[in-house]
């Protein structure tokens, strides 16, 4: 059975509205190509039915919070945090790094999820939305949840793009961080640095060499805090 490591309903928000497909931009800067969201990040039977059901419940709990425009209550904050932790761990790259084998992944996912969730609730108690304006946009990728550190600061932010126009970040801070470049460029470069093979976008004109240059200039190294 084909199973998704990135929730299809969320990835659909990155479809090109004219093509109804997502643009896949290879990390090695080869020519981009488009595919339906339902055909991306699928793998055959990489997890057990029980684990698939456990993860589906996480995605279901998060759905109302994603739709809400106002401030989240405690239950909604928990649901969004669970979704972020799920997508931090479940992608193909993280599975290679966190687990020794597919069997190890299926046996230990729940315990690793709970461990990372507890750390996240402690270290990232505040969630903020950032809305992109004008022609700026956010990308996502096959490692959708990234952790970045604003230049000159010690604390990390955990971020993911909800859509091409909305970024969520989790932190322990009450003020938004300041960046020397547009937050869209900084986050997109971090998404590029963190991805395994592909950056995903609703646009064909994402410039991968530019993202690679920004990642080098700011010494962006993907990290998961422990």
Regions found by a protein language model. Give the residues of each.
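Alpha-helical structural context detector biased toward long hydrophobic helices
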Residues: 1-226
């Amino acid at each position: 059975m084909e199973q998704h490591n990135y929730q299809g309903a969320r990835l659909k928000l990155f479809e090109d509205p004219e093509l109804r497909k997502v643009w896949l931009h290879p990390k090695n800067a080869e020519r981009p190509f488009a595919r339906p969201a339902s055909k991306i990040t699928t793998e055959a039977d990489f997890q057990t039915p029980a684990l698939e059901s456990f993860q589906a419940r996480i995605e279901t709990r998060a759905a109302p919070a994603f739709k809400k425009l106002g401030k989240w209550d405690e239950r909604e904050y928990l649901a969004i945090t669970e979704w972020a932790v799920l997508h931090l761990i479940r992608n193909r790259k993280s599975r290679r790094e966190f687990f020794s084998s597919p069997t190890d992944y299926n046996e230990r996912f729940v315990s690793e999820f709970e461990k990372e969730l507890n750390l996240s609730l402690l270290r990232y108690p505040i969630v903020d939305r950032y809305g992109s304006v004008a022609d700026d946009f956010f990308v996502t990728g096959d490692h959708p949840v990234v952790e970045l550190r604003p230049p000159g600061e010690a604390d990390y932010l955990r971020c993911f793009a909800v859509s091409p126009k909305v970024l969520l970040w989790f932190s322990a801070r009450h003020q938004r961080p300041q960046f020397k470049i547009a937050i869209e460029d900084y986050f997109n470069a971090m998404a590029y640095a963190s991805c395994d093979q592909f950056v995903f976008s609703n646009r064909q004109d994402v410039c991968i060499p530019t993202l690679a240059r920004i990642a080098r200039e700011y010494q962006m190294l993907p990290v998961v805090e422990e």
